[in-house]
Structure formats: structure tokens, C-alpha cells
Amino acid sequence: MDLVFRPERYPFLTQDLPGVGGEIRVEPEDFQVEEVPAYLPKGEGEHLYLLLEKEGRTTREVLEFLRDEVGVPEKEIGVAGLKDKRAKTRQWFSIPRKYEDALCLLENLQGVRLLAADLHTNKLRTGHLKGNRFHILIRRPKGGVAEAEAVLKRLAEKGVPNYYGPQRFGLGGLNPVRGYKLVKEGKGRGSPWLKRFLIGSLQSLLFNDWVALRMALGLYDRVVPGDWAKKHATGGEFLVEDPGEAERALRLEISATGPLFGKKYPEAQGEARAIEDEVLARYGLKREEFRARRGARRPIRVPLAEWKVEEAPEGLWLSFFLPKGSYATSLLREVMKVEALDHLEAEPAPEDAEGL
């Protein structure tokens, strides 16, 4: 029974296509992320939205500065998602309008720049984003534009495997082991947030195993009766009863969803449920052992949009858009076929915290 997260245990969708190799995040500006908001501020209201560009700073560090130096109570600071430290990122924050005069203090926070500010009627909430645009440099690649484009074309046709990335599993990928102990014993040291996060790591490992099993069974881009499927255009979920829905899955209009086991999530039926049970049985786990968690369903794949590859003297630039909750590393591992990139440190994004 191996509960340690190891990226090599998960198959590539593009196994038959060569990777380009190379390195990422040699410099922070090699990894650029732009948050795409679910909505823009209206220009009126009691909440001030701030578009910040940061480099070499975690989102948490910015939150703490707004709290400690600007004086905003932490519960009144809004953020849609967390962004990596070793990257150049643009994201929105919100604070109450009454703190507007203190924003000049942001000039004292090295690595952070205020790009825009506007008013809105509500606080920015976790998950209030469409997704993220990425602009990533692969340095010293062995392959070229043609190899990268072949992989991205396949991913655009079939969808990007929605594996959880290394951010979810902690140093050495050991958090699922700690989460398993909490599930089995029902107690342990640490704050409630830490316990939720550790059990969330176990939920995520089980989900990744489910994705890999569906691939092995030839059901990655299929749905079967009993599946809960997600409509990519609207986000709605429904129970698959008509075998004819398989055609919509092949067109990437819908995708099967996998479980983040808990007490409040739609449960699969029939063959689809049996696949989930097989993953649980590997570790001697039962559904009822996750009743302390909320639970959710997560699509097996996500659409890839706005993708492009450009050659530069320093390497290959990849540009693409992914929906919220998905991981750029899941795409990069397909393009590069280099597992070492999955061990990069990054910050877990709260929009990925469904089911905790």
C-alpha cells in the first residue's frame, strides 16, 4: 500500500509522443500567471479591488502585509486564489473602501506593484475566477516547437488530465500518509485547517488514482451509465443514464467526474461506482470514513484553450489558458516528459479546495 505521492505512478495521456525535456522556473519571470476574474469591478460600491503584480512573493505574504501594515482585518481581505511564489503573477485582491488612503504603503512591499484599483459592490471570494493564463518558458529543451505543438494539439482534442499537482501533497509527497492516519484514527495533532488539508491530500491521491485507472480501462474520454458528468460549457453536473452521452464525451462537451469522498457529493452508480470502489479497496478504505469531510466531484480532464508555442533564444515559450482548479504542471509534464518538475514547491490554491 503506497500512499506517497509519486508523479511517475500516473500515466501520460500523450505517452506515444516525445517530450521536449528542459527546465522551468529557472528565473521567476520564466513562469508568468495572469488570473482571469469571473467579473470585473463595477466602479461603485464599498469594496476596493486591487490588481497586483507580484514576483518572489506568496499571496499569503501580500495578505499579511495588508493586514499588518495597511491595517485591514484579515477576514475583510478578499482573494480568489493563491499564486506561486517563484513566478511573476497578476491577481486581484479586495479590501474595504475605507482603507484606500493607506494604499501608498504598498510601495514598501518589495516585489509587488499596484496595476489598477476600482470599486465593487461585494468582497472578492475564493473561487471567483474563470481560470488562469500562463506564459511559461522551458529553458534548454531537447525538442522543438513541432514536438511541443503535437502534444498540445492532442491535449486540446482530448482534454488535459486533471491530476492534482505536487502542491497538494507536501514535501516528499507524504501528506496523504498523514491524512490516512487521521481518517483511520479520527484524531491527531494540529489545527482544524491542517487536518482538513492533510485529509484533502488523501482525497486528492485517491482522485489521481481514479484518473489513472480510468485511463487504463480506456474510459478517459468516455462516460458510462452511472457516471456523474460535467458540462464544460456551463459547469452543470448530471447523472449519465443514456449510453448515447458517450458521443458528447468524445467531443469534449462533457467529461466524467471523479470523487473527492465525503458526506455531500453525488455518488456514482453501477460500473462507474465499481471503479471508485476499486480505488478505495487498494488502501482498505471505505466511503463512510470520509463523512467528516464535505466531499465533491472533480472532472477527469479540463479543456485547453488559447495555446501557442514560440521559439526564443532562451528556449520555448508556452502560452495557454486553464480553468480554475487545474494545475499547469499537469500540462507541462505531458509536454516535457520530465517528472522532476512535479517536485517544485508551490502554494496550494484555495480554488482547488473543493471537498475539504
Swiss-Prot record:
It is an enzyme of class 5 (isomerase). GO terms for molecular function: RNA binding; tRNA pseudouridine(13) synthase activity. Keywords: Isomerase, tRNA processing. Its EC number is 5.4.99.27. It catalyses: uridine(13) in tRNA = pseudouridine(13) in tRNA. Gene3D superfamilies: TruD, catalytic domain, TruD, insertion domain. InterPro entries: PsdUridine_synth_cat_dom_sf, PsdUridine_synth_TruD, PsdUridine_synth_TruD_insert, TruD_catalytic, TruD_insert_sf, TruD_pseudoU_synthase. The active site is at 84 (nucleophile). It holds the Pfam family TruD. GO terms for cellular component: cytosol. It comes from the Bacteria. PANTHER family: TRNA PSEUDOURIDINE SYNTHASE D (PTHR47811:SF1). HAMAP family: TruD. Belongs to the pseudouridine synthase TruD family. This is tRNA pseudouridine synthase D. It comes from Thermus thermophilus (strain ATCC 27634 / DSM 579 / HB8). The lineage of its organism: Bacteria, Thermotogati, Deinococcota, Deinococci, Thermales. The gene is truD.
